[in-house]
Amino acid sequence: MYLGRFIIIGETTAVYRVSSRSYPNRQIISRDNMLTVVPTSEAAQTNNPYVSYNCMRQGGEKIVIGNGSHVDPIAEKIDRGYPARDALAEALLALDYEKDDYNTPRIAGIVGSSSYVGIIRQDAVIIRSISEPTLVSTYENDAPTTAQLSLKGDIEEIAQKAYELEYEHPVCAAAVTHQGQGESGDIVAQIYNGK
């Protein structure tokens, strides 16, 4: 099954995976306390605005994760004191689904004292608080559903397992978590760009 890009949001940990048929030459890099999806050196040049973006960023003491440029305004709104749910809803509504050939949904999640997952599609906006690991993807599973991946344990293993989930066309994955006491713990991220 082809899910496209997907997130799994848990209470203290989140996963992001890029799966792609159109732009497989991408990787996740760490820079300036963010995780960013960028083309690899082998990638053909493109002016497609949906190929490179921050997929993880800290907002206040929360972790914001998503499949595009909406990650930045969500984190910025949280930094300004917005409640997590409102920051997620406002940014998704403002930026809407991607205006590509597939009307690709935007997906995002927030990990913190209250964790949320959201999606904006051409036909719906869904924002949910979560209490168990929850998956939402750009294709097929485009409504929040219980994830089939445990988010407990070693963060490096979680990133690799996310990459290895049996969904088609994996490109790269990352996992991020709060280590320590709840939201006040350090944020630790792990990238897995394939073998």
Curated annotation (Swiss-Prot):
Catalytic activity: IMP + H2O = 5-formamido-1-(5-phospho-D-ribosyl)imidazole-4-carboxamide
Primary role: Catalyzes the cyclization of 5-formylamidoimidazole-4-carboxamide ribonucleotide to IMP.
Alphabetically ordered keywords of this record: Hydrolase, Purine biosynthesis
The family this protein is said to belong to: Belongs to the archaeal IMP cyclohydrolase family.
S-S pairs: none
Protein name: IMP cyclohydrolase
Gene3D superfamilies per record: Inosine monophosphate cyclohydrolase-like
Native organism: Haloquadratum walsbyi (strain DSM 16790 / HBSQ001)
BP GO annotations: 'de novo' IMP biosynthetic process
Domain of life: Archaea
Enzyme Commission code(s) on record: 3.5.4.10
Pathways involved: Purine metabolism; IMP biosynthesis via de novo pathway; IMP from 5-formamido-1-(5-phospho-D-ribosyl)imidazole-4-carboxamide: step 1/1
InterPro entries: IMP_cyclohydrolase, IMP_cyclohydrolase-like, IMP_cyclohydrolase-like_sf
SUPFAM superfamilies, A to Z: Archaeal IMP cyclohydrolase PurO
Molecular function (Gene Ontology), one example: IMP cyclohydrolase activity
